Amino acid sequence: MCGNNMSAPMPAVVPAARKATAAVIFLHGLGDTGHGWAEAFAGIKSSHIKYICPHAPVMPVTLNMSMMMPSWFDIIGLSPDSQEDESGIKQAAETVKALIDQEVKNGIPSNRIILGGFSQGGALSLYTALTTQQKLAGVTALSCWLPLRASFSQGPINSANRDISVLQCHGDCDPLVPLMFGSLTVERLKGLVNPANVTFKVYEGMMHSSCQQEMMDVKYFIDKLLPPID
């Protein structure tokens, strides 16, 4: 990867305390790194699960006056009708699929992997889960939206994850990605995957961030879908 400006440092990893039989891949938000989320998962970890928090490559972001910062894809605007970086989103999804493949090579089947993320990372996790042929255990999407929503059919998706479990979380005081985005996204998701498996949790007073209750809800979701198998 030397000389490629898309390269990013190795992910922050919280290793399993014993043999890893499941994994969580969690994607941070715009301008962040995986380190803070790795610390958060270290606080709610289970001994058989490996938690992988990759770092986005650094690129110019149109929304922020083309300043260079860690970003999974370019963000042009934050309104519902903003133009989207279609090629960048699709390329980023391929990067995430490669991370999933790497864990499968390490001996963890894809249906023992949960994909998740916060804000831009959550958006990418939803898009990847809905477009990959890798069957996943679930998605945990925090304070985010569904990118390229017009590219999805009106009916259920015809892919491996039409019955996937989704935990979507949002703060009701989010000034950056308004709660309405989360509400619209969850309604769209219920048309794309089995609606019985979609859970939407709203946290009173929470802004564009996380909170202790949300992390406990994430832990419960992960531990329920990825129980120990030995």
Swiss-Prot record:
Annotated localization: Cytoplasm; Cell membrane; Nucleus membrane; Endoplasmic reticulum
Subunit structure: Homodimer.
Protein name (record): Acyl-protein thioesterase 1
Main location: cytoplasm
Tissues where this protein is expressed: Ubiquitous. Detected at low levels in all tissues tested.
Gene Ontology MF, one: carboxylic ester hydrolase activity
Function, as annotated: Acts as an acyl-protein thioesterase. Hydrolyzes fatty acids from S-acylated cysteine residues in proteins such as trimeric G alpha proteins or HRAS. Acts as a palmitoyl thioesterase that catalyzes depalmitoylation of proteins, such as ADRB2, KCNMA1 and SQSTM1. Acts as a negative regulator of autophagy by mediating palmitoylation of SQSTM1, decreasing affinity between SQSTM1 and ATG8 proteins and recruitment of ubiquitinated cargo proteins to autophagosomes. Acts as a lysophospholipase and hydrolyzes lysophosphatidylcholine (lyso-PC).
Lyase found in the keyword field: no
Keyword terms, alphabetized: Acetylation, Cell membrane, Cytoplasm, Endoplasmic reticulum, Fatty acid metabolism, Hydrolase, Lipid metabolism, Membrane, Nucleus
Signal peptide start-end: none
Active site (record annotation): S119, D174, H208
GO terms for biological process, alphabetical: fatty acid metabolic process; fatty acid transport; negative regulation of aggrephagy; negative regulation of Golgi to plasma membrane protein transport; protein depalmitoylation
Cross-referenced InterPro entries: AB_hydrolase_fold, LYPA1-2/EST-like, PLipase/COase/thioEstase
Source organism, top-level taxon: Eukaryota
Catalysed reactions, as listed in the record: S-hexadecanoyl-L-cysteinyl-[protein] + H2O = L-cysteinyl-[protein] + hexadecanoate + H(+); 1-hexadecanoyl-sn-glycero-3-phosphocholine + H2O = sn-glycerol 3-phosphocholine + hexadecanoate + H(+); a 1-(9Z-octadecenoyl)-2-acyl-sn-glycero-3-phosphocholine + H2O = a 2-acyl-sn-glycero-3-phosphocholine + (9Z)-octadecenoate + H(+)
Family: Belongs to the AB hydrolase superfamily. AB hydrolase 2 family.
The organism's taxonomic lineage, starting at the top: Eukaryota, Metazoa, Chordata, Craniata, Vertebrata
Any single Gene Ontology cellular-component annotation: cytosol
N6-acetyllysine: modified positions: K224
EC number: 3.1.2.-, 3.1.2.22
